[in-house]
Regions:
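Helix-capping/transition residues at the boundaries of transmembrane alpha-helices
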Residues: 10, 84, 95-97, 173, ...
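Junction motif at the cytosolic side of a transmembrane helix
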Residues: 242-266
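Short, membrane-interfacial amphipathic segments enriched in basic
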Residues: 1-5, 146-149, 265
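N-terminal Sec/SRP start-transfer signal
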Residues: 1-16
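Transmembrane helix segments
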Residues: 30-37, 183-219
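Alpha-helix N-cap/helix-start motif at helix boundaries, enriched for small hydrophobics
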Residues: 104-106, 259
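Secretory targeting signals
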Residues: 16, 21-82, 106-179, 220-246
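Transmembrane helix boundary and interhelical loop/hinge segments in multi-pass membrane proteins
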Residues: 79-103, 110, 266
Length: 266
């Protein structure tokens, strides 16, 4: 697909690679900070579930998973800004000249972006995991549970569900970018939505908030760590997965309809 290949070329730019680099460095730092707090004997209600999970097969993903909020934010910024930039920088019309099929163009861009986000996530988790394993072994802490077959299966479940979460967040970012057509507005609204509205809704309507997109997406990887660490899907994993897929489908359909009917003046 022409649009897909064209988008892949953009990932060689330092500005794009910088986002992936920040994701890796920040997540590794948070993971090591969490590891240090656990192994240094620090206590507190927030640390107790992490300390209890630490020696188990889910211990490694519990530690590196503490950087998930940052991973989501960076992935959302990368996708949203990349799509919205086509309007802000006035390049969308030129792209449509080379690829007249609007939906093929949008699909190609999103496939490339999701691939890049997935690769960035894989590198982030691998590097963070390697750092924590090396740090643990240097202190004489057993990592046998983490590297056992059951531990590896837990890692793969976490990675697979984290990919689903980031795909959902990327599609949300696509929708916001298509609606706003501005980098500043798209990134601002996307981050604001992730940080504020669903939390406010949960205060007044807790049961309903459990089905909102960001929460449902977060429940997927949250289901692979101990319940005390979470967030565990209160509606059950299967229901959360089905609703997440429905949200993703809705984002794709609305984005496609809006993009198809937009007047392109850029």
């Amino acid at each position: 697909m022409r649009a897909f290949r064209s988008e892949l070329l953009k990932f060689r730019r330092w500005s794009v690679l910088a986002g992936s680099g920040v994701m890796i460095a920040a997540t590794a730092f948070i993971a090591y900070l969490t590891f240090h707090q656990i192994t240094s004997g620090a206590t507190g209600p927030e640390l107790t579930p992490l300390i209890q999970a630490f020696p188990t097969t889910q211990g490694l993903i519990t530690v590196i998973g503490q950087g998930r909020s940052l991973i989501i934010a960076i992935a959302l910024i990368m996708v949203t800004s990349n799509i919205a930039a086509e309007w802000s920088q006035g390049t969308l019309r030129n792209l449509l000249v080379r690829e007249p099929g609007r939906l093929r163009l949008l699909a190609g861009k999103m496939l490339a972006l999701v691939l890049f986000v997935t690769i960035s996530l894989a590198l982030t988790l691998l590097i963070s995991a390697a750092l924590i394993i090396v740090a643990a072994q240097s202190q004489g802490i057993s990592t046998a549970a983490w590297t056992s077959s059951e531990g590896m299966r837990a890692d793969l479940r976490f990675f697979g569900n984290e990919v689903l979460c980031l795909v959902g967040m990327s599609l949300l970012g696509m929708l916001i970018a298509v609606l706003t057509r501005s980098i500043g507005a798209a990134v601002g609204i996307a981050l604001a939505y992730v940080l504020v509205p669903e939390g406010l809704i949960a205060v007044v309507w807790r049961d309903g908030a459990e089905w909102l997109p960001v929460r449902v997406f977060n429940y997927l990887p949250g289901s692979t760590v101990p319940a005390a660490v979470g967030p565990t899907p209160p509606q059950g994993y299967t229901a959360a997965l089905l609703v997440a897929l429905l949200w993703m489908t809705g984002f794709v359909v609305v984005s496609a309809v809006v993009f198809w009917h937009q007047d392109i003046n850029a």
